[in-house]
């Protein structure tokens, strides 16, 4: 109706005046987590600054450590320039609805990156409202609402002790500080010196666990961690692991070097065996097959013991393999004594005495002058 009564120029002037006066708008951003909501509050500025985009502030993450203190941190490196952001907080259901500033800031490279809130200021089951703000640009601020009972991280269990309930049954007990036992859920892990992986079991409420059957020849290791259970909250954050405890001191633990040696030798030995089998298989494939015993009858009956003909070996190859025992003869003739005729026998012929194998040449002596 106002737009119809005013001219376009008058309506534009009225808009500019309203913008200079400064109106605030509130935008509610929803997220996938129903427990966390953020209210982004932007204050209008002069028209010449409206075109510049407002950079969002980093998200604040809060965790309550064993209900002793709470740390709320943010990523200070996400800012384009080094900025000391300020944090204010309050509880939604409280008499005082005003924000109070953090009294103990955490720093990263001399830039504020978190806030530590002490135990007396923690109200676990009231909605925690936290506001992050840029002091240089007051229009840059972000508000988040958190349910602290879902953000509790317990301290690691302590004083783990083992006792024998019977000859083959063990009981493990431990303690937790500052948190009621009914509000905690435990994860117990154990293994022996012959196991490669952990066996784990969830234990609710009571800080004890029994192992019904143990082997005296093994050495067992136990450890425990905890989290806030669904009765008191729905935290998914586990505590750190407790210090491990052992049972079976008379058993010598496996030497890690032997395990490493086994881990190397077993694969290498397996590969060597496979390669050897492959070579043996290829060698057997190249060897001719051994004929059945009944086929040997042909060697005696049909081929009359001629193995070469029976096996199919060529005649030329057979002859080349046969040994040659022939020898060349050496011919020897006797040298006559000095002054006598060479080879002259009783018959007066120089050829009457000679080797029986071949006729030697005949010689005649030339008389001396």
Swiss-Prot record:
Protein name: Cytokine receptor common subunit gamma
Organism lineage: Eukaryota, Metazoa, Chordata, Craniata, Vertebrata
Disulfide bridge positions per record: 62-72, 102-115
Signal peptide boundaries: 1-22
Gene Ontology terms for molecular function: coreceptor activity; interleukin-15 receptor activity; interleukin-2 binding
Membrane-crossing residue ranges in chain numbering: 264-284
Domains (record comment): The WSXWS motif appears to be necessary for proper protein folding and thereby efficient intracellular transport and cell-surface receptor binding.
Subunit structure as annotated in this protein's UniProt entry: The gamma subunit is common to the IL2, IL4, IL7, IL15, IL21 and probably also the IL13 receptors. Interacts with SHB upon interleukin stimulation. Interacts with IL9.
Residue span(s) of domain Fibronectin type-III: 156-254
Family: Belongs to the type I cytokine receptor family. Type 5 subfamily.
Purpose of the protein: Common subunit for the receptors for a variety of interleukins. Probably in association with IL15RA, involved in the stimulation of neutrophil phagocytosis by IL15.
UniProt motif (WSXWS motif) ranges: 238-242
Alphabetized UniProt keyword annotations: Cell membrane, Disulfide bond, Glycoprotein, Membrane, Receptor, Signal, Transmembrane, Transmembrane helix
Motif Box 1 motif mapped to chain: 286-294
PROSITE patterns: FN3, HEMATOPO_REC_S_F1
Extracellular compartment segments: 23-263
Membrane-related topology note: Single-pass type I membrane protein
Residue ranges, Cytoplasmic side: 285-369
Localization per Swiss-Prot or TrEMBL: Cell membrane; Cell surface
Database matches in InterPro entries: CRLF2-like_D2 (IPR048648), FN3_dom (IPR003961), FN3_sf (IPR036116), Hempt_rcpt_S_F1_CS (IPR003531), Ig-like_fold (IPR013783), TSLPR_D1 (IPR053856)
CDD domains to which the protein is assigned, alphabetical: FN3
GO CC terms of this entry: cell surface; external side of plasma membrane; nucleoplasm; plasma membrane
